[in-house]
């Protein structure tokens, strides 16, 4: 038997949670199983990028104010040193001068630690900062954290997403996970900003 009830949890991001409660009898004991699913915020074109992006690989706070007068590419990726994420980062590195010439700075974000980011940057000589969003606050506010399928199983994780943000901090374009081709992602961006 399933019972469905809603509970509003108010904290920093005012997320809503939906709890499913199932009763079952096991050895004469009542057991409750609960799973939490957040009601996702949907970041869309025309929305403002959060002012504080988080801490970079050096532990320094990164804010949108630091990019005033410049456009920013904020790209969310699942994990340092994995094949797709490395291909995407290297694509952005290889075309970094072209992106800069077009008026864009680049910032990556994943749930990896600052130490992991530092090693990733050093290993591939990445010229842009990476946000260590270990608490997933930025990823959730960007709607870049959610359920996805990996190896046939449903898991929670980072949804590879890229945001093109104008000089005023407003999202101009969003590349969804299905649109991103990691090996040529910088070329996709350059084509979109022509």
Task: List each language-model region with its residue ranges.
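Compositionally biased amphipathic helical and low-complexity segments enriched in hydrophobic
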Residues: 5, 13-19, 50, 93, ...
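Secreted/luminal cysteine- and crosslink-motif detector
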Residues: 25-26, 86
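Intrinsic disorder/low-complexity segments enriched in polar/charged and small flexible residues
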Residues: 26-27, 147
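Short, positively charged and aromatic/hydrophobic N-terminal segments
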Residues: 6-8, 14-22, 29-33, 39
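Chalcogenol-based redox active-site neighborhoods
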Residues: 32-194
